[in-house]
């Protein structure tokens, strides 16, 4: 790791956030351009469609993921949970999935051995839909996103297909990146933890031209990390420069790039014996030491924002992503009758992907007969090419055995006998329209629809099979808001979703036919309230999400999938976010979700969905006093997750409920910030998620993290 260590030392490493020098005022049509300095950007100003600047504290008064405009949340008939930059900093998150623990209604799912963009469940519905500035990140097999260049995380609840296209009805995640700033600064930080993390970061920004029309932002993160898991370590390097050019007062061009190098040890966690946990220490590694997987992921965004006049605005954007993954792992497939000897297979992966996306959005504001409109018209085109070479041994003929209680590693590697070599091309064209309608001071409506034209060509070269499919789908959405008083809004919405089932399936590939697409329906009723002058947002919602033709792991054919029929999730959620006082900030929520199979030829009707707890909740609170103690901050977090199904086969295997407590303290002085975080302060033993009895991911034992940030 010599190059990585050198990068860490030279970087000085930052963990802190860039603090806005002024509060941000948002309007329906536009958002602040970070580089504009004090004041606000009006509808005639220089905002970017689909982006939003820094917000102070834990504020969530506006979010762009629901409508791609910065309409205040209380006026939008959709629920969006937000984790601003201060949340990421307060919990010392290095990856965005750590923040999910404090976003209500988001449950962890399969993390693919730590390799890729994790899957998660929103409102009980599993998804891997994650976006960055509105562009899809879950194409190919990129590494989990680093938190260093993230300004805020938004979780859209309910169907988002009316804007984003093929997706899942429970919701999606959209990451908003840090943007160029006129304020000149450079921030160095360093972060270490009790499991061997050494992390360095840089965050810098300012003007590149004397007249301030060319601005930049540069983020770097370099780290080497250990783990509470034996033989599991990782290295990661992120380089993320952004440059914006204000060509004219009405036109701005932004170029944003990101380069990621990632090395990890593929880790499927621990196993259960007779569907019971706790027989093995959570540190026990059941793979093969020394086997690493390497990932390269490079992306480019180019955005052109143009203002025609005070009411009309155009955004043209392109996104390119290319990456590759290569490595080996050993994974458990069976256990012998002695309940201690497991059979493993050897897995060799070589993946490559190329993604190109083009987007065009036109936003206009106008009145018709006294009714106000904010109209969004858009189109996008996506092309994804991927090659997946996945080779493995046969655990039945070459068991690659391991004693789980007294493991002896370093056996001769078994021969590769089961090849899989896939080529896949996906193209998708979307046309969409949305209207935010102001019917009166009390009543607002949201209507929208998207048309998707989807094409897929899938080739399995090893067995010379082929699947081609074309689909056309319309995804409508509608909602209504009633504000009887300025501080309260009652709302309802309904929307649909569409997702083609792609990739290999045992039956479908041999027949040469495609699986039917997943379809979804979601609807909710709720209330939002802004308290304390709008600094605290409360949301209550009752929801129901239905999904058909769900693709789930096939228990009879490892590595393949089947369409499970229909599932349903219904429940309610309560959230509170923002500032209770200038000294106290809060992010809290509780979710009740009853998520079950409603129709299936394999799984029992009524079986709970994997990794979805019926009860879950979290609370993160930070207090920073004024006066003589100004600069000190103390806080804590509580994460509670109920019992949930541990596999998708309806076997009765259950992950136990848990409550984990975190604590934090920091001190800001002059241009520095020092902090101490303690994750799982009471060292609670728990399990985050599982895929089946052979793939169970234990939660972290007590972890101490120290960080220092210096800003110039």
Question: Where are the regions a protein language model picked out?
Answer:
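Membrane-embedded beta-barrel scaffold of Gram-negative outer-membrane proteins
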Residues: 305-319, 323-329, 491, 517-579, ...
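Acidic, small-polar-rich N-terminal luminal/periplasmic segments of exported/outer-membrane proteins
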Residues: 32-183, 525
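C-terminal beta-signal and adjacent terminal beta-strands/loops
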Residues: 639-647, 666-712
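Face-selective signature of the C-terminal outer-membrane beta-barrel domain
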Residues: 300-323, 345-459
């Amino acid at each position: 790791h010599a190059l990585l260590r050198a990068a860490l030392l030279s970087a000085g490493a930052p963990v802190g956030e860039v603090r806005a020098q002024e509060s941000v005022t948002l309007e329906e049509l536009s958002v602040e351009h970070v580089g504009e300095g004090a004041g606000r950007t009006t509808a005639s100003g220089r905002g970017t469609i689909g982006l939003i600047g820094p917000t102070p504290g834990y504020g969530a008064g506006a979010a762009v993921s629901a409508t791609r405009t910065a309409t205040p949340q209380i006026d939008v008939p959709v629920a969006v949970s937000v984790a601003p930059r201060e949340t990421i900093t307060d919990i010392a998150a290095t990856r965005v999935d750590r923040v999910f623990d404090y976003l209500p209604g988001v449950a962890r799912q399969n993390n693919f051995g730590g390799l890729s963009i994790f899957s998660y469940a929103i409102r009980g519905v599993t998804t891997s839909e994650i976006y960055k500035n509105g562009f899809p990140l879950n194409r190919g097999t990129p590494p989990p996103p680093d938190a260093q260049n993230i300004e805020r995380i938004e979780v859209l609840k309910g169907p988002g297909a009316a804007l984003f296209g093929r997706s899942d009805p429970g919701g999606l995640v959209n990451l908003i990146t840090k943007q160029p700033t006129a304020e000149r600064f450079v921030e160095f930080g360093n972060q270490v933890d009790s499991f061997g993390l050494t992390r360095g970061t840089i965050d810098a920004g300012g003007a590149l031209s004397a007249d301030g029309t060319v601005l930049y932002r540069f983020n770097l993160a370099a780290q080497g990390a250990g783990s509470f898991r034996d033989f599991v370590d990782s290295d990661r390097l992120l380089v993320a420069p952004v440059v914006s050019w204000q060509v004219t007062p009405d036109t701005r061009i932004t170029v944003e790039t990101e380069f990621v190098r990632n090395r990890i040890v593929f880790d499927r966690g621990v196993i259960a014996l007779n569907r019971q946990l706790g027989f093995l220490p959570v540190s026990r590694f059941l793979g093969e030491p020394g086997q690493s997987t390497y990932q390269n992921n490079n992306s480019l965004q180019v955005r052109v924002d143009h203002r025609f006049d005070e009411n009309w605005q155009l955004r043209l954007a392109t996104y390119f992503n290319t990456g590759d993954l290569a490595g080996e792992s050993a994974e458990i497939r069976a256990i012998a009758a002695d309940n201690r000897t497991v059979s493993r297979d050897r897995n060799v992966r070589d993946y490559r992907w190329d993604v190109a996306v083009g987007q065009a959005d036109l936003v206009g504001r106008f009145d018709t007969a006294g009714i106000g409109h904010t109209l969004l018209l858009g189109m996008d085109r996506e092309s994804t090419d991927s090659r997946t070479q996945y080779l493995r041994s046969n655990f039945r003929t070459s068991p690659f055995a391991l004693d789980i209680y007294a493991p002896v590693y370093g056996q001769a590697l078994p021969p590769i006998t089961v090849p899989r070599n896939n080529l896949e091309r996906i193209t998708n064209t979307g046309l969409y329209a949305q209207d935010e309608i102001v019917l009166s001071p009390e009543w607002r409506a949201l209507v929208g629809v998207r048309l998707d034209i989807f094409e897929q060509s899938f080739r399995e070269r090893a067995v010379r099979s082929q699947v081609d499919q074309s689909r056309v789908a319309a995804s409508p959405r509608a909602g209504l808001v009633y504000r009887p008083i300025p501080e309260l809004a009652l709302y309802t919405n309904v929307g649909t979703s569409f997702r083609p089932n792609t990739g290999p399936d045992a039956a479908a590939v041999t027949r040469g036919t495609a699986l039917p697409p997943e379809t979804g329906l979601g609807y909710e009723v709720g209330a939002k309230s802004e308290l304390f002058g709008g600094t605290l947002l409360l949301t209550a919602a009752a929801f129901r999400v239905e999904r058909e033709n769900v693709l789930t792991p096939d228990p009879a054919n490892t590595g393949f999938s089947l369409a499970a029929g229909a599932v349903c999730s219904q429940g309610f959620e309560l959230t509170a976010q923002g500032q209770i006082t200038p000294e106290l900030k809060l992010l809290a929520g509780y979710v009740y979700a009853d998520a079950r199979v409603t129709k299936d030829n394999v799984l029992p009707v009524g079986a709970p969905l994997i990794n979805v707890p019926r009860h879950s909740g979290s609370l993160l609170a930070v207090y920073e006093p004024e006066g003589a103690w100004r600069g000190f901050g103390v806080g804590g977090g509580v994460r509670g997750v109920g019992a949930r199904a541990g596999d998708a086969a309806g076997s009765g295997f259950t992950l136990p409920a848990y409550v984990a407590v975190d604590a934090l303290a920091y001190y800001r002085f002059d241009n520095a910030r020092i902090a101490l975080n303690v994750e799982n302060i009471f060292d609670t033993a728990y399990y985050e998620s599982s895929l089946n009895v052979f793939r169970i991911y234990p939660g972290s034992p007590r972890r101490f993290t120290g960080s220092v940030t210096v800003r110039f």
